[in-house]
Amino acid sequence: MAKQEDQFKNVISHAKEYGYVFQSSEIYDGLSAVYDYAQNGVELKKNLRDYWWKAMVQMHDNIVGLDASIFMHPTTWKASGHVDAFNDPLIDNKDSKKRYRADVLIEDYVAKYDDKIEKEVKKAAKRFGDAFDKVQFLETNPRVLGYKAKGADILARMGKSLEQEDLADVKSLIEELGIACPLSGSKNWTDVKQFNLMFGTKLGASAEHATDLYLRPETAQGIFVNFLNVQKTGRMKIPFGIAQTGKAFRNEIVARQFIFRQREFEQMEMQFFVRPGTQKEWYETWKTSRLKWHISLGLGVDNYRFHDHDKLAHYADA
């Protein structure tokens, strides 16, 4: 873990030193989780975006592009569920005054079981040498199976509590696991509360007559509200796709990991519309297709794996 953190720090240092990424407004002490792409970074991002656009749009007859605006009618976000469901469960430590995502605290705790499993694997590999079968070991070793079961039980309980909006049980789980504040070591927690991730703003010349708006938290809704327009004017027949790239904004309270978790970021997204009942088939087709595209970037096959989420977005079923 320490080695990975050192490597991550080296990447950040390299990105700044060689003109790829700068801290935004750095001369004024910067702004947390907001970054500027520098002279080399902007070219790298443009090349990647152009390559994605060519592969996703220009090489498919049944996929077209779109450039929707950042501002949308506020009813859009009510209808999509973002106003009511686009939330993070947050918890404060009373002693450090630090705020955390409750689910991340629990997931970080479960990750310790993965570290323990890795230690068991290393010990066994050293003990058995060339005869060591890692797959069989992971499937049969009692300690490993015990760690897996504990982690799975914790995540299952958390997932059920969040799904049922039982935030009291999420706090109870944190207390039962003895999770402490990473900063202070204190276990003195507040209740868990939901926090909406959308940035709000106003449209209008005066405050009393202004309309509440949001900076879009994703590009997908611009595609959905233009579905009929694109279908009619482009004479598109299902199955077909609509793609776009553009800025999105999320008021991340726990923003970390450099450019991998920002409050302002760019998305490259394609929504593919299919007939009901065929979504699983198309899902697998696109999983295979997109993996080939990622591998074509030359970063190595071993650096990619599919991760099936236990906790899905409020609008997803896979």
Please tell me what each predicted stretch does:
Residues 2-318:
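TRNA-recognition modules of translation machinery and tRNA-sensing kinases, especially anticodon-binding
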